[in-house]
Amino acid sequence: MSYEERVNAHPNLGDESDVEEEALVNDYREQVNFDDGMSELERTTSLGAASQTQDLQAQLAAAATPLEYQATLETKFASYDNYCSLFHYILNSEGPVELEVPSYYWAWDVIDEFIYQFESFCRYRNRVARSGSNEEEAQLLRENPNTWGCYSVLNVLYSLIQRSQINEQLAAIKRGEDPLTVAGEYGSRPLYKMLGYFSIIGLLRVHCLLGDFSLALKTLDDIEMNKKAMFARVMAAHFTTYYYVGFSYMMMRRYGDAIRMFSHILVYVSRTKNFQKGGNSYDAIAKKNDQMYALIAICVALHPTRLDDTIHSALREKYGEQLIRLQHGGPEALPLFEELFRSACPKFISPTPPDFDNPAVNVDPVDHHTAIFMDEVKNTLYNPTIRSYLKLYTTMDLKKLAGFLEVEPEKLRSWLLVNKQRSRQVRWVEGGLLEGEPVNANDLDYALENDLIHVSETKAGRRLVDWYLRNLARVY
């Protein structure tokens, strides 16, 4: 069968219709009762080296199984060794490992658990170093600096991507070519293709945890953020991808793009929540769902915009008074910004082991990134108040506005310049996630001529047709 015939044998997933949305929802309904594919994987046999295949199946099953919450340090070390052994065998065997996999669900579970254990180990090691209370564990960690090291984890993910040629395959699909022509002997096997694909999502997550938000987005250059992407077929992967992409945009001050990403996945979740409750990942998804509503509340406060009706209603229900306080700005809003950010941000990690001999010099990565974000918030604290005055005038004297705000004119001038610069944001249109066009993010613009402020306001008309269509669909 040719590549064109294989493509035409499947429904057109590029269609943005409600029919496609329902198909995606139905596909997720099938996932809910899926037991991670492990039972099928354990039953799979190879006609060749049966015992070796069964051993690999057992290792894959163990790799996808969550580690106990109260696991000892020795257990965490052993888990790292098991992952190293598994990935070394898959990547460095003579020729591709022959193993028929039941589906793509298990591959996400393996990569997801691998990164989760890396993240939790790094946070645990940092806590031990900062507290300085458990000398025995500190000594063990000091003697094993490379266990769950950042370089080792990144090396595994990049190696799986390179071995599977998955980026080349995705680029070929974008060009309308057959991906098998560039897949090679490894990438044509589902085992390598699935692990390589979800390693890209894993890299997005790891780079975001390390605080490199532009590199996090760069890793997704060959993945299209739409319903036909493979990650959209696995609910946990779908949710994770949009969360980390949206958060990366937010930390890069691209609030419009962040809102777009958060809104997309939150609308999808609202449509599938009735049958999520039976799934194994329901609690994790529900927690991430709440976190994204907190992040979208922050983004809307920093970048006022009109939201989807579903998102707007849920946001008002969850953060009614808090949202109003955020939008009003001022010093009293600072603690609320920090509280929401800490509750919704990823659990950041440090790329290097901590200093066990000097606990005081170790910084909590979450505190570090929170401080960076709060510096940005402080620059925009008075924007709502300034906007409320400027909307009343077409021209206004700088000293007059400074008198209203009870600040020094030069301090107000610096606020206005910062606000002017922040109002110019890059907005994604097409291409890679880092690409975009600079646009004026506010409906209010102004220019300074010495001490005279010239104000212009543009009001976008309401799209009443869309509003009527949405509400007619609800009635009928």
From Swiss-Prot:
A single MF term (Gene Ontology): translation initiation factor activity
One BP annotation, GO: formation of cytoplasmic translation initiation complex
Record text on subunit structure and interactions: Component of the eukaryotic translation initiation factor 3 (eIF-3) complex.
Domain named PCI: residues: 257-452
Keywords from the UniProt entry: Cytoplasm, Initiation factor, Protein biosynthesis
Location relative to the cell: Cytoplasm
Signal sequence, start to end: none
HAMAP family, per database record: eIF3l (MF_03011)
A GO CC term assigned to this protein in UniProt: eukaryotic 43S preinitiation complex
Protein name (record): Eukaryotic translation initiation factor 3 subunit L
Organism per entry: Aspergillus clavatus (strain ATCC 1007 / CBS 513.65 / DSM 816 / NCTC 3887 / NRRL 1 / QM 1276 / 107)
Function field: Component of the eukaryotic translation initiation factor 3 (eIF-3) complex, which is involved in protein synthesis of a specialized repertoire of mRNAs and, together with other initiation factors, stimulates binding of mRNA and methionyl-tRNAi to the 40S ribosome. The eIF-3 complex specifically targets and initiates translation of a subset of mRNAs involved in cell proliferation.
Keyword Cytoplasm assigned: yes
Highest taxon of source: Eukaryota
Family named by the database record: Belongs to the eIF-3 subunit L family.
